[in-house]
C-alpha cells in the first residue's frame, strides 16, 4: 500500500513517467559496433580488479537517456539507493573510461574511511562495477555473468529512482559513512579471508563453433562446468535455446558468411565483454568420394566450411585473444585424417590438414602476444549427429564386427565420446597446458596408423 501511495504521489506531481529523447532512441538503435574497444576496456578493468571479469554493455534508449543526462556527473555520484547495494555496485559508477583514476579515487575513499574503525580492514578490489560512458552506454561488471546481471538489474532500478527523485525535487543518498560501513562490515570482510575455490575459468569467456550438437555441445558443457561464460555458434537455430542460463549465449551463425561472424562477435562483446578462449569445432564430414569422382564444387564447399570459415573466425577473434586478461587460448578440433588420411576422404583430409597448418602458423605469429593454440585429433567419435544407429550397424557389418566392437576398434579397446574430446579441449585452455603451443594430441584410444 505504501509503495502504491508513493507511486501515485509521483504520478500526480509529474515525476513518475521517465521521458526518453527521440534522438537518443535513434542513436541507441544505430549504435556502431565497438567490439574491439569493449574487449580492451574489459582488459583494463580486469587488471585493476586483479581477476578476469564479465563486462555487459547496454546502449538502449533508456540507458542512453541516463548516460547523456545533463547532470549525470552530479546525479550518478551521490551514492546507492540503499547502502546494501554497495556490496554489488560499489558506491558510485565510473564516469567515462579512466579506470586508473577510479582505482586511485577508491583507494583514497578506503584510506579516509577505514581510519574511523579500530578493526584492521582489508581493502576490496578497486575496480568499478557500474560504468556510464557516452560512447559505450551503461556497462556492468561481475566475476561471472550472473553477478554482472544482478549489478545491471540493481542499477536499472537506481537510474529510475534517481530520475524520478530529481523530477520531483532532489535525489539524496545515505551518508558516505553509512555506505562505507555496510561495504566493510564484518561478514563481507570475513569472506575475504575464506579460501575461495573459484572455478578454473571464472570471469572468462569461451567461444565454441559448431556448438549445437556432438563435440561442440560437449565443449560448451565442459567450459560451463569450469566456470566460463560460453558463446555457442551454429547454423542450426536450436543453438539459441540450447541452454537457458545467464552464462550461455547461443547465436545462429553461418560461418561461411563474414557479415554473420562480425554480427556474432559484436553480440559477444556486448553480452560478455570479450573472448578468452576459442574452440574451432565446426566442420562437415561428407560422404565418401574418391578423387576421380570428386567435383570442384564439392571440393570448394568442404574447403569453404572446414578451412576458410576457420580462417575468418581466427582472424576476427585475434584482437579479443590479444586482450584476454589471462592470455588467449585456442583449441582446434582436428582429425585422425591429418596424420593418417583414408581413401574416399580427399577433400575432408586435405581441409583438416590445411587447418592444422594454419594453426601451426598462428602459433608462430601469435606467440609473442601470449596466445597459445593446440590441436586435438579425435577418431571414431560415434555419439554425434553424423552417426545414426543404422549407419553404425552398416559400418560394423562391413568390417565383420559387432557395433560395440566397432566402437572400440583401437589398441586400447575403449570407446571415445564427445565428452572425452571436450574435456581435453577445455583442459588445453587450462593451466596444465600453460607452457604448450602447437601441440597435436590424438584422442582415439590408439589408432595403429597414427601410432
Give the positions of each predicted feature.
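Short C-terminal tail/terminal secondary-structure segment
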Residues: 285-288, 432-433, 437-451
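Short, small/polar-rich loop/turn modules that mediate ligand/substrate recognition or access, typified
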Residues: 367, 372, 436-438
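Active-site loop immediately N-terminal to the catalytic Tyr-X3-Lys motif
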Residues: 292, 340-346, 368, 413, ...
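Alpha-helical segment proximal to the catalytic Tyr-Lys
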Residues: 319, 364-365, 434
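Residue(s) in the substrate-gating loop at a strand-loop-helix junction
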Residues: 335
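Substrate-binding pocket helix/loop in short-chain dehydrogenase/reductase
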Residues: 289-291, 295-300
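Active-site helix of classical SDR
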Residues: 314, 351, 359
